[in-house]
A protein has these predicted regions:
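C-terminal accessory/tail domains of diverse enzymes
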Residues: 1-96, 100, 104-112, 153, ...
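Short, glycine/charge-rich beta-strand/loop segments that flank catalytic centers
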Residues: 83-87, 114-130
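Short, well-ordered, mixed-charge alpha-helical segments that flank or form enzyme active sites
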Residues: 124-129, 169-171, 190, 197-200
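Acidic, His- and aromatic-enriched active-site or binding-groove loops in soluble protein domains
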Residues: 134-157
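An acidic/histidine-cluster motif and surrounding catalytic segment
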Residues: 162
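Inter-helical turn/loop segments and adjacent helix faces that build the functional surface
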Residues: 165-177, 189-194, 261
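Flexible glycine-rich active-site/ligand-binding loops centered on an Asp-His dyad
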Residues: 181-189
Length: 365
């Protein structure tokens, strides 16, 4: 039996129509929105709250936590608001919950002058530099956790975690699926491309987020229960589960954000199909940076990316032959047939409108 969940990062424009990032938005600006959103007590213990207490709801502020000289959080530099679903037994259930949570967030944010926009990489700021500079305690914390040393990337990028797990599957098999998804990631991610903006203008490709993050951030992360199942790698493939509900979870982290949630449904079905597939033999512990960067620039216009994406999609479709979830693959098949991603639409709109803000205002419609 499969289980599904989605974590979706939302960026905003403020009441002035400016992109609301850490340069002009405080933690309290976003927290006032989260404070107005409901708390569902039955969500726990499957949702992780975390030590700082920021992650109390289905919505929470995504950002960079600051410390004094102890583990007590004294501030959080905000980049946006994340929506997370509970664990669902169906893909449709996860999509329905995400959709309901998104509409509630949009309605609540509007009362404070914020409107959600589709962004997968900060269109103006390329690098996050903590101010004031990191203190000795913070530097020691980062040195202890190599993946946490990439704050300069995750604070300017926005993307989903697409989560699947399979009941009672031995952890060795779960890790093998994680290796498989890492290997085929360059051919999966173009279905989601939505980051064609960089440093105030158009980038020379379709996903600057993919181009910059690959090799430094995980493509897939598998949560394990015991230390002996950890595989040492940078970026990480495996991580110790922080709560029991995380054990055996596979998080696919490489995709750009989507404003059409049917693409998330398609991607979850694709991941499910690849987990079931017995024909594809590729495995990798760390993502192939070169292939991801080729993919990021050309997408499905690159013949190797297109052919391998076709192979991956076909393998998933074959594995789901008698599964009703096969229907969720339809949007991905359309994207592949046309070789057009969301980035293509955004580029065309930008060329017509001449403004990044005016372009992204037309997302989430």
């Amino acid at each position: 039996m499969f289980f599904f969940g989605i974590e979706h990062e939302v960026a905003f424009l403020n009441h002035e129509g400016k992109f609301a990032d850490f340069s002009c938005t405080k933690f309290a600006d976003f927290q006032q929105i989260v404070d107005k959103l409901p708390l569902y007590p039955h969500d726990y213990p499957q949702l992780r709250v975390g030590d700082a207490g920021i992650k109390k709801k289905r919505w929470y502020i995504e950002g960079f936590e600051r410390f004094a000289d102890s583990e007590a959080v004294i501030d959080c530099v905000a980049k946006g608001i994340e929506i997370r679903t509970t664990i669902n037994s169906t893909i449709q259930g996860a999509i329905d919950e995400l959709t309901a949570s998104f509409y509630l967030l949009r309605e609540t944010a509007a009362s404070f002058g914020f409107s959600p926009v589709l962004i997968s990489f900060n269109p103006y700021t390329c690098v996050f530099e903590p101010q004031p500079p990191l203190n000795d305690f913070e530097l020691r914390q980062l040195q202890a956790y190599p993946d946490e040393q990439t704050a300069h990337i995750y604070m300017v990028s926005y993307g989903p975690d697409l989560n699947i797990s399979i009941a009672d599957l031995p952890i060795e098999n779960v890790i093998d699926i994680g290796k498989k998804l890492t290997y085929y990631s360059p051919f999966i991610v173009p279905f989601s491309y939505s980051s064609p903006f960089y440093n105030g203008s158009l980038w020379e490709g379709l996903s600057v987020r993919t181009f910059i993050r690959t090799g430094k951030r995980s493509a897939t992360l598998v949560f394990v229960e015991n230390q002996e199942h950890l595989i040492k790698s940078v970026p990480s493939l495996t991580k110790i589960a922080r709560i029991p509900a995380e054990v055996g979870r596979i998080e696919f982290k490489a995709c750009d954000s989507c404003d059409n949630f049917s693409i998330y449904a398609g991607l979850l079905a694709l991941l499910k199909g690849l987990a079931l597939d017995k024909t594809l033999e590729g495995r990798a512990i760390v993502p192939d940076t070169t292939l991801h960067q080729i993919s990021a620039k050309a997408g499905f216009d690159h013949d190797d990316i297109f052919l391998n994406a076709t192979k991956v999609l076909q393998a998933a479709e074959n594995a789901l032959e008698n599964d009703p979830d096969i229907k969720f693959l339809a949007p991905l098949k359309d994207i592949l047939a046309n070789r057009k991603t969301k980035s293509h639409q955004l580029i065309e709109m930008f060329e017509n409108l001449g403004s990044i803000e005016e372009t992204i205002k037309r997302t989430y419609v």
